[in-house]
Swiss-Prot record:
The keyword Repeat is annotated on this UniProt entry: no
Reaction equation(s) it catalyzes: (6R)-10-formyltetrahydrofolate + 5-amino-1-(5-phospho-beta-D-ribosyl)imidazole-4-carboxamide = 5-formamido-1-(5-phospho-D-ribosyl)imidazole-4-carboxamide + (6S)-5,6,7,8-tetrahydrofolate; IMP + H2O = 5-formamido-1-(5-phospho-D-ribosyl)imidazole-4-carboxamide
Pathway(s) where this gene product acts: Purine metabolism; IMP biosynthesis via de novo pathway; 5-formamido-1-(5-phospho-D-ribosyl)imidazole-4-carboxamide from 5-amino-1-(5-phospho-D-ribosyl)imidazole-4-carboxamide (10-formyl THF route): step 1/1; Purine metabolism; IMP biosynthesis via de novo pathway; IMP from 5-formamido-1-(5-phospho-D-ribosyl)imidazole-4-carboxamide: step 1/1
Protein name per UniProt: Bifunctional purine biosynthesis protein PurH
Keywords: Hydrolase, Multifunctional enzyme, Purine biosynthesis, Transferase
SUPFAM superfamilies for the chain: Cytidine deaminase-like (SSF53927), Methylglyoxal synthase-like (SSF52335)
Domain statement: The IMP cyclohydrolase activity resides in the N-terminal region.
GO CC entries: cytosol
GO BP terms: 'de novo' IMP biosynthetic process
MGS-like domain segment(s): 8-158
Taxonomic source organism: Caulobacter vibrioides (strain ATCC 19089 / CIP 103742 / CB 15)
Molecular functions per Gene Ontology: IMP cyclohydrolase activity; phosphoribosylaminoimidazolecarboxamide formyltransferase activity
Family the UniProt entry places it in: Belongs to the PurH family.
Amino acid sequence: MPAAPDYPSAPDLVAPKRALLSVSDKTGLVDAAKILHAAGVELVSTGGTKAAIAAAGVPVKDVSDLTGFPEMMDGRVKTLHPVVHGGLLGVRDAADHAKAMADHGIGGIDILYVNLYPFEATVAKGGSYAECVENIDIGGPAMIRSAAKNHGYVAVCTDPSDLAEVLEALKAGGTTLALRQQLAARAYARTAAYDAAISAWFAEALGQDFPARKSIAGTLRQTMRYGENPHQKAAFYTFPNPRPGVATATQLQGKELSYNNINDTDAAFELIAEFDPAAGPAVAIIKHANPCGVAVGATQREAYERALACDPTSAFGGIVAVNSRLTREAAEAMVEIFTEVVIAPEADEDAIAVFAAKKNLRLLVTGGLPDALSTGDTFKSVAGGFLVQSRDDARIKASDLKIVTQRQPTEEEVRDMLFAFTVGKHVKSNAIVYARAGQTLGVGAGQMNRKDSARIAALRAADFGLDLKGCACASEAFFPFADGLIQAAEAGATAIIQPGGSMRDPEVIEAADKLGLTMAFTGVRVFRH
């Protein structure tokens, strides 16, 4: 490990004399170049960046004029040179550095503005392997890291907003050490995220589900007043190219989203994505990341009213998600009780107008539904590390069911079982869902044993006058004993859907036959913790 040299303290104020600009995103470039030139800053640039500046009539040198080397190898080598990196890394007030710079004709570079080749965008648009590789920037990250390391003297900018701060600082005579430190921190965060994106792409391209090293990179979207509880700090970061959901949503009205709002809204929207809008309107109401009512209907308003009927008490202060464009009629029903968030792919203008009277209600539109079968990873932090798993993309169809009882289900019972199991996939384990005709009637969530979940779900239905006779009962994991199934049958369920796979399956099947139930095994467990 290199020892830390005894360098002189960095100056608080640096009046820049030279800037190197090399950008792929040229937003605001010419205006910035004009301001720098007017401030007496010499401009050095490369390729297309230089051409854009020169075309505007602003004096600019080519980096080759400094290095004495032309760009070569299709532009792969242009700034990887001691004159460039010496100009970025040289400690101006260290005598030996100053001598080396003088001996080798190296001038200091006080401002570096680089934004990197659009690797992430190339991947997002489905670029070929060769295109993605060619859009891996080498010289840019190298310069950024050099400049950021020497932030005692160099202001490094990786985004137009960074450069805007530097230009503003010039009005006061130069960049301060505090600003340069902030810019350096952002620069290293940018190169870290860039390398993480490259690493993730290579792992996927090579079919490596779990590479030896895995990085998670996100962009700060929002800093929150507090986290899950008031004594916890929190922020919201988004991944590159996120799928439709909270991360892509535009907030049309309401207070700032809280940590719990985002967590619950994500759960609601992931659930509602299970329901194809082409099959009709569907609505989910979520509380503490658990569904308290889910339903389909002939209209969106009907779907909402049926979902609300499952547990109107828990729906108070909940999250509502819809799978289709939000309508005025549905919005009018939603504002009748206190709701924290409504999230939809789109919203009619007259629906938005209905919510305007509820200024605290947060209305989000995402621009689309996520693909419930899309690939990707989910993460969970544990002490000292994090767990990674592929997204739960289980989708059960009628043809997947194995009927294990003597009685075969009716077509209506099959539909009810599939609906209940789809909802159960989004209920915290142990989970029991009673449903009939595209409507949840009772949800039992998060209990330590399955019998209690079945009992609580039935109590919920009774509390709100919902008759469970002839309903379907879904369990997200197998019944380890017959007691949970018996509990469901006593509540009124006649059709049971569960994964199967218990060593006591024969005992459970026997109990179902004695009770005259029909039961289907899915062969797929959908735990949720």
